[in-house]
Amino acid sequence: MKALIAALLLITLQYSCAVSPTDCSAVEPEAEKALDLINKRRRDGYLFQLLRIADAHLDRVENTTVYYLVLDVQESDCSVLSRKYWNDCEPPDSRRPSEIVIGQCKVIATRHSHESQDLRVIDFNCTTSSVSSALANTKDSPVLIDFFEDTERYRKQANKALEKYKEENDDFASFRVDRIERVARVRGGEGTGYFVDFSVRNCPRHHFPRHPNVFGFCRADLFYDVEALDLESPKNLVINCEVFDPQEHENINGVPPHLGHPFHWGGHERSSTTKPPFKPHGSRDHHHPHKPHEHGPPPPPDERDHSHGPPLPQGPPPLLPMSCSSCQHATFGTNGAQRHSHNNNSSDLHPHKHHSHEQHPHGHHPHAHHPHEHDTHRQHPHGHHPHGHHPHGHHPHGHHPHGHHPHCHDFQDYGPCDPPPHNQGHCCHGHGPPPGHLRRRGPGKGPRPFHCRQIGSVYRLPPLRKGEVLPLPEANFPSFPLPHHKHPLKPDNQPFPQSVSESCPGKFKSGFPQVSMFFTHTFPK
């Protein structure tokens, strides 16, 4: 009996210590693939590019390897709607100001075999922040650049720009502005320029619940006199738009998802090349290589919508709203389809509440002073040293701070065309931002319901100043079942590691080495 007890204790000890640090350079292929899957999962914002693997641990459970990764990232200028591979994003147009936004993501991924193509992302949690103001050096510069946090204030400018584009491109007649992603202002010389990036979506005049989803992305440049106060009438307006074909991002296996299981465009092994933007005969060439929802039963294969508007490719089948209590814990992987566990226990479900990425009104002044648009009541991460947070950003009891919810990413969400029904349940629950960082919702960026537990969250924090470090994302991930795992003495997944691997962090890949100062670990050991 004593021998049996000793054996059981040894087995338990073995599994309790199974999560082990690993070399950051050794897991680089998995980290790159995981970041690609995360980008393809996201609905809003810009593609993350990998700067560095900050930490890496792994756990081997029978034939499955679980990766616990901490990735330092930087936003590119490519919209996530492009579905590009993050390393294929071209450098930004030097004529337009490009905001420098850094971030850190904690990621849990699994691989059942030794093939990297089998990698699945189980969950992720990211924090991002702009460092443009902190890096600005305009002591002798005649040009001042501001990056605004409250982008919703410039929706009128986006609408005006899109209207001009519609006048010259009939195929864009039914498109509307969706989200205002970035707004920059350049002052100096002979005038003032506003540079507005925004996503658009197709909104036909008549409601067709089976209408395919089509999204696009536009960049508008509006120029005014130096002291112009009226932003309604720019002296010059230039806009470039491109549309992304959802058919290119369907299940690459060609197998339609089961009805009732949320299907998402993300999870492809590789991003397909986007088709050229709509360019009707006689229209001007409005594009250059940018870096950058409706619900119902699936339509029959031969069904098409003949409403007014651009000819739309057939996209992923929209879905009927479904009860969260019937959802399964879903993951997404490189086979192009969303994966589901076979555990239907409602306790494994994590209802989320869907919120957009929005911030207080805030502009980044080159001298780190607040322009008139600033909201002085917003909380800042100033003075928060990484060691002042819980290890790896872990919140004590897994609750989020009051008043803040994550942005859950789902292509099957509602946009400006389709306000959610009043009886539509909200099913969003996330991991929470770093403690002490609350953010108020802005106008026009309300909750977007979706069908089921969402994978992954991205939190936009206030801009960093010189000497500050990016707060770490939380790591209170919910439990998930490992595939093909039947061992009764080992939990499904381990808590996210609190220690740092001795073989980490890796080296920075960025062309901006100065951003390294904003991360916890600046130099490799």
Curated annotation (Swiss-Prot):
Its cofactor is Zn(2+). Proteolytic cleavage produces several HRG fragments which are mostly disulfide-linked and, therefore, not released. Cleavage by plasmin is inhibited in the presence of heparin, zinc ions or in an acidic environment. Cleavage reduces binding of HRG to heparan sulfate, but enhances the ability of HRG to bind and tether plasminogen to the cell surface. On platelet activation, releases a 33 kDa antiangiogenic peptide which encompasses the HRR. Also cleaved in the C-terminal by plasmin. N-glycosylated. Residues 310-320 have a biased composition (Pro residues). Glycans are attached at N63, N125, N344, N345. SUPFAM superfamilies: Cystatin/monellin (SSF54403). This is Histidine-rich glycoprotein. The gene is HRG. The keyword Chloroplast does not apply. One of its GO terms (biological process) is regulation of protein-containing complex assembly. It comes from Homo sapiens (Human). Residues 323-348 have a biased composition (Polar residues). The keyword Disulfide bond applies. The lineage of its organism: Eukaryota, Metazoa, Chordata, Craniata, Vertebrata.
